[in-house]
């Protein structure tokens, strides 16, 4: 492994941490409806647990209602049950072939809990990014010890990895501020 490889690996891993945070934040419910709420709902499809998005079309009907239209008519009841059992606090209602999923408005107390959850997710992401920095720095020290790079190269690479870390931590903070604003908007 070279110094460039260590930096590239750290960058890729930090980017994955950001993507994971974005996915986790998408699951946090806000006052508005969004299709991401149902992304992890699993439906029993011919005996196999299948992602809801693979057995139904999920759309937004309005700001507070999600529409779910199963591809097969006989799946309507199964999909409705899966949404109800997904422990999301949602109560779907069937209208013919369409399942309407109204999202209830969040109480002030629940909004504050959601903000705490968002901050917790962000802190986990920051910890992951810092751990990646630590691993990269250890790799650089090992390269220096093995005389695969000079002290100057190692020092420069550590500085660049620190800049990367700062950049990604700043991105985490930005994502959190956006999500907090979204959660607290009534």
Swiss-Prot record:
Spell out the subcellular localization from the entry: Cytoplasm
This protein is called Ribosome-recycling factor
Domain of life of the organism encoding this protein: Bacteria
What are the UniProt keywords, alphabetically? Answer: Cytoplasm, Protein biosynthesis
> InterPro entries given for it?
Ribosome_recyc_fac (IPR002661), Ribosome_recyc_fac_dom (IPR023584), RRF_sf (IPR036191)
PANTHER family noted in UniProt: MITOCHONDRIAL RIBOSOME RECYCLING FACTOR PSEUDO 1 (PTHR20982:SF3), RIBOSOME RECYCLING FACTOR (PTHR20982)
Q: What CDD domains does the record point to? A: RRF
SS bond list? none
Which GO annotations describe the biological process of this protein?
Answer: cytoplasmic translational termination
| Organism of provenance | Herminiimonas arsenicoxydans
Q: What is its main location?
A: cytoplasm
This protein's GO cellular component annotations are: cytosol
Its biological purpose: Responsible for the release of ribosomes from messenger RNA at the termination of protein biosynthesis. May increase the efficiency of translation by recycling ribosomes from one round of translation to another.
The family annotation for this protein states: Belongs to the RRF family.
The molecular function GO annotations come to: ribosomal large subunit binding
């Amino acid at each position: 492994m070279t110094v460039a490889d260590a930096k590239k690996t750290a960058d890729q891993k930090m980017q994955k941490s950001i993507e994971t945070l974005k996915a986790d934040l998408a699951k946090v419910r806000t006052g508005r409806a969004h299709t991401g709420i149902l992304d992890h709902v699993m439906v029993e499809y011919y005996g196999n647990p299948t992602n809801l998005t693979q057995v139904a079309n999920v759309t937004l009907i309005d700001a507070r209602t999600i529409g779910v239209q199963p591809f097969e008519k006989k799946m309507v009841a199964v999909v409705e049950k899966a949404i109800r059992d997904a422990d999301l606090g949602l109560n779907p209602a069937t209208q013919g072939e369409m399942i309407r999923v109204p999202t209830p408005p969040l109480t002030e107390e629940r909004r504050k809990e959601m903000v705490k959850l968002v901050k917790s997710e962000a802190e986990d992401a920051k910890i992951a990014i810092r751990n990646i920095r630590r691993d990269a720095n250890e790799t650089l020290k090992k390269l220096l010890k093995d005389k695969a790079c000079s002290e100057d190269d190692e020092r420069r690479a550590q500085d660049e990895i620190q800049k990367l870390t700062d950049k990604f931590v700043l991105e985490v903070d930005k994502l959190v501020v956006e999500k907090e604003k979204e959660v607290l908007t009534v």
